[in-house]
Amino acid sequence: MDRSLQSTHAKLVARDIQRLTQSPTESNSFSLLGGACVSRVEIVGTIVSRDLTPKFLKFGVDDGTGCVTCVMWLNQLTSSYFSRWDPATILLLASAARKQAAQIRIGAVARVRGRVGSYRGVMQITANVAVAERDPNAEILHWLECLKLGQSCYRVRIQS
């Protein structure tokens, strides 16, 4: 298994994210059709849905190849997961998450980075970073990067 993509955000389009399959050897990794394993992804697309609750922001990103559901947690101040963290760090994380959530508006083009996972049989991204893009070419450039990386990095070559 190729572990070179485990520590990086793989740039993928929605269609590729939806086609990920659970890795048979690791619970938090998913396999691309080419054979490479990923756990973190990056996608750029238009925000098509937005559902804000006190605990999280759930939004949909459509890049033309499909739509991926993204979840950004906003409960850093009340979650027991963060109870052992430094309070200053928790405040910083909570503040950053709230600012990023405010940028996510329907119709905006956004870049989302986070951990990929499956929830009720559907692939989704648990977003660490979600920022609105100001560059009108960002989505097209992301597509071109995905094509190039798909051909050069994400395909596992069998050495004979």
UniProtKB/Swiss-Prot annotation:
InterPro entries per UniProt: NA-bd_OB-fold, NA-bd_OB_tRNA, RFA2-like
GO biological process: telomere capping
Principal location listed in the UniProt entry: nucleus
DNA-binding region (UniProt annotation): 41-133
GO cellular component: chromosome, telomeric region; nucleus
Phenotype on disruption: Plants display an immediate onset of growth and developmental defects and reduced fertility, probably due to impaired telomeres. In nearly all mutants, apical dominance is completely abolished, leading to multiple inflorescence bolts that are often fused. In addition, floral phyllotaxy is perturbed and siliques develop at irregular positions on the inflorescence bolt. Moreover, leaf size is substantially reduced, likely reflecting defects in cell proliferation.
Example of a GO MF term: DNA binding
Location(s) in or outside the cell: Nucleus; Chromosome, Telomere
Keyword terms, alphabetized: Chromosome, DNA-binding, Nucleus, Telomere
Tissue: Widely expressed.
Function: Component of the CST complex, a complex that binds to single-stranded DNA and is required to protect telomeres from DNA degradation. The CST complex binds single-stranded DNA with high affinity in a sequence-independent manner, while isolated subunits bind DNA with low affinity by themselves. Associates with enzymatically active telomerase. Plays a genomewide role in DNA replication and facilitates re-replication at non-telomeric loci.
Quaternary organization: Component of the CST complex, composed of CTC1, TEN1 and STN1. Interacts with CTC1. Interacts with TEN1. Interacts with POT1A. In vitro interaction with TEN1 and POT1A is mutually exclusive, indicating that POT1A and TEN1 may compete for the same binding site.
PANTHER family linked to this entry: CST COMPLEX SUBUNIT STN1 (PTHR13989:SF33), REPLICATION PROTEIN A-RELATED (PTHR13989)
Protein family membership: Belongs to the STN1 family.
Name under which the protein is recorded: CST complex subunit STN1
Taxonomic lineage of the native organism: Eukaryota, Viridiplantae, Streptophyta, Embryophyta, Tracheophyta
